Amino acid sequence: MNMKYVLSVINNLRDEWYKPPSCYYHRKRIEFEYQSYARSAIDEICFYLMEHENENPITAVENFRHMVDCFACETKNGDANFMFSVYYDVASDVLDVLLGMQ
């Protein structure tokens, strides 16, 4: 898969699936945090892919997902644990899309 194409698909996912809702102030705090972390996760996945551009994108996203899962398991901080679990969920979504593109 072409890395530029993969990155554009992932950025489109961010804009479509995790776009900031227009009613920010009427949402529950946890929903707002989830959406914010999800958008951040997409950005981190893109950075990770750019750093590992010679690697297969599917393998790179699997490695990213494993890495954040390890972070979630090792942290004792509840807020950080929530963030890493969101990153894991988003990486799983991205991985599903990439596998579907094969």
Cite the ranges covered by each PLM segment.
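Short intrinsically disordered terminal tails
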Residues: 1-4, 23, 52, 96-102
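Tandem-repeat/low-complexity and Cys-motif detector
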Residues: 2, 28-37, 80-89
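Generic structural signal for well-ordered, non-transmembrane alpha-helical segments
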Residues: 11, 35-43, 85-92, 96
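Amphipathic alpha-helical interaction modules
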Residues: 16-66
